């Protein structure tokens, strides 16, 4: 894309035919968000690994620079942040102080397969992991936490008001089973 504007919400789903630009749009967003982890900027980081500038630039127009930006709006604020990548792979960042606090979860299409045991998440940011590798750890830690009533998609009296009961309800409703995740004391699994 030379220029595209996308409106994103709490859950955004990209659909379309092959080579329509879904992955390119997602990679641009991920590239911006992974700049939170580095002062110098990253083409290769936690969310994506793009390689080198020469591999991602538009060779048809002989691009010597890549510019990517986004505007973030929420109830309290609106701000823009952007990056520019030149042929020497120098990344110039603009206004990334505010994006550091942006709540963002990315679950890659390539997820972890079936394992005998799953590792605990020992990272500072407590999530399910980019590949879902910490999903069971997250479930074991959050199982008993209450969920706000407005977040229920079914009747509370049918399932209870905690995260684990809601997960079990929906797994049973969709696939006919429930799940238990427990930590093994004295280990990181």
Where are these regions (language model features)?
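Pre-Walker A-like glycine/lysine-rich segment at the N-terminus of P-loop NTPase domains
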Residues: 1-31
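Phosphate-coordinating catalytic segments in nucleotide- and nucleic-acid-processing enzymes
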Residues: 35-189
């Amino acid at each position: 894309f030379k220029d595209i504007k996308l409106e994103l919400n709490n859950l955004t789903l990209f659909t379309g035919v092959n080579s329509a630009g879904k992955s390119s749009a997602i990679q641009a967003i991920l590239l911006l968000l992974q700049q939170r982890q580095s002062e110098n900027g990253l083409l290769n980081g936690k969310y994506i690994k793009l390689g080198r500038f020469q591999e991602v630039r538009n060779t048809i127009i002989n691009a010597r620079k890549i510019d990517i930006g986004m505007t973030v709006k929420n109830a309290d604020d609106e701000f823009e942040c952007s990056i520019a990548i030149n042929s020497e792979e120098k990344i110039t960042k603009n206004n990334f102080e505010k994006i550091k606090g942006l709540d963002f979860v990315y679950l890659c299409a390539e997820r972890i397969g079936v394992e005998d045991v799953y590792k605990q998440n020992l990272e500072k940011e407590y999530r399910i992991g980019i590949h879902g590798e910490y999903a069971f750890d997250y479930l074991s830690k959050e199982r008993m936490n209450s969920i706000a009533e407005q977040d229920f998609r079914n009747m509370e009296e049918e399932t209870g008001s905690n995260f684990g009961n809601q997960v079990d309800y929906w797994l049973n409703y969709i696939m006919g089973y429930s799940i238990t995740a427990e930590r093994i004391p004295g280990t990181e699994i």
